[in-house]
Amino acid sequence: GFEGPLRPRAFDARKAAGVSSSPFEAATLLKNASVDFGIWTTDKAMPALARDSDGDLLLFIHDGEGDLFCDFGHFAYREGDYILLPRGTMWRIEPKARTVSLLIEAINGSYKLPERGVLGPHAVFDPAALDTPKLDAAFKAQRDGEWKVQVKRRGALSTITYPFNPLDAVGW
């Protein structure tokens, strides 16, 4: 038993998340000066690109699958994937199924690979398992025309409108 004000807590974060096409409308779960944890549910393609200038963004795909398009190319995501979006990266997703993501923003910071340690099946992390976006047919077939980019800087949102799709990389 417990005596005093300390009590175990458990909550279903998915119940906190309303459905939105913008990751900047994610429900905040925990936040301090270094990190912002939120939960985001979306079931349709993002109508605008997103760019976070405050820090690196890590998405953990709790449920769902779809396609992610960013400055570096395209790749398909699915349940259980971690997606790292470095600060300043423009990106959007097109879910094929309702997608629930945990968003972890490293405010004024960045994510780094862990120190090398144990190798093999007992390793905490295997860099060989990393995947990167590709400049494939899906990336090249994106809709052209006017695109909006929602930019988060110092916690505030601004919108930039381009007369073309700014996700137009030809190599990296």
Regions found by a protein language model. Give the residues of each.
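Jelly-roll (double-stranded beta-helix
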Residues: 1-172
